[in-house]
Amino acid sequence: MPKHYCDYCDVFLTHDSASVRKAHNSGRNHLANVRDYYASLGHDKAQSIIDQITSAFESGQGPPPGGFGFGPQHLQAPPQGGFAPPMGGFPPGGFPPGPRPPFPPGPGFPPMMPPGAPPFPPNAMPPPGAFGGPPPFPPNGPPGAPPFPPNASQQGGPPGAPSFPPPPGGFNGPPPPSGQNSQGPPPPTNPGPGGMHPDRARMMGPGGR
């Protein structure tokens, strides 16, 4: 697995994984190095960097091909050996200026539709190629019809009945322990003076009312 190089600390991390980078970036030495770097830039340079990032964000474009021109990588030569291109096939400096290419549809997502088109044709199936497997919902039926087809495994059950048999004994809860009735909670055992619970009376001490 390729190693990740931290420009601020001038070190290679053990692996290039999100958890390792997150742990490194929250470390005391890394934060001190970042703070020292930006403090050495001066107010005008830092403000110009902020303006570049803000204008790129507002225009909806990615960073310029060479980056924004800040960070330690622009002050010194890269380490020997170079780096492999980032995983996923994206260009090293981000997307080029201009409109970004659409991402290819993954499995389970419909292809790009023309602007203003409804997501699915009314009372019909989704367009061909929209889903790789069976449709998640059946086509729209007449108004007032149930959203799902009746279950074929039900033998004469009423509409809306569950598609599985109820458990033995129905849906009632567990039976109460022997010696208790099923009507409400059990009465308190030997209430204390004035109807107070014995634990509370004990906590309050003698004559604690």
Swiss-Prot record:
Biased composition regions of type Pro residues, renumbered to the chain: 93-150, 159-191
Annotated Low complexity bias: 72-87
SUPFAM superfamilies assigned: beta-beta-alpha zinc fingers
Keyword field contains RNA-binding: yes
Locations listed in the record: Nucleus
Superkingdom in the source lineage: Eukaryota
Keyword Cell membrane: no
Keywords noted in UniProt: Metal-binding, Nucleus, Ribonucleoprotein, RNA-binding, Zinc, Zinc-finger
UniProt GO BP: mRNA 5'-splice site recognition; spliceosomal snRNP assembly
Pfam families attached to this UniProt entry: zf-U1
Gene Ontology MF, one: pre-mRNA 5'-splice site binding
Chain spans, region Disordered: 72-209
One cellular component (GO) term of this entry: commitment complex
Zinc finger (Matrin-type): 4-36
UniProt function note: Component of the spliceosomal U1 snRNP, which is essential for recognition of the pre-mRNA 5' splice-site and the subsequent assembly of the spliceosome. U1-C is directly involved in initial 5' splice-site recognition for both constitutive and regulated alternative splicing. The interaction with the 5' splice-site seems to precede base-pairing between the pre-mRNA and the U1 snRNA. Stimulates commitment or early (E) complex formation by stabilizing the base pairing of the 5' end of the U1 snRNA and the 5' splice-site region.
Subunit structure: U1 snRNP is composed of the 7 core Sm proteins B/B', D1, D2, D3, E, F and G that assemble in a heptameric protein ring on the Sm site of the small nuclear RNA to form the core snRNP, and at least 3 U1 snRNP-specific proteins U1-70K, U1-A and U1-C. U1-C interacts with U1 snRNA and the 5' splice-site region of the pre-mRNA.
HAMAP family cross-referenced by the UniProt entry: U1_C
PANTHER family reported in the protein's UniProt record: U1 SMALL NUCLEAR RIBONUCLEOPROTEIN C
Family, similarity comment: Belongs to the U1 small nuclear ribonucleoprotein C family.
Protein name: U1 small nuclear ribonucleoprotein C
Organism of this sequence: Coprinopsis cinerea (strain Okayama-7 / 130 / ATCC MYA-4618 / FGSC 9003) (Inky cap fungus)
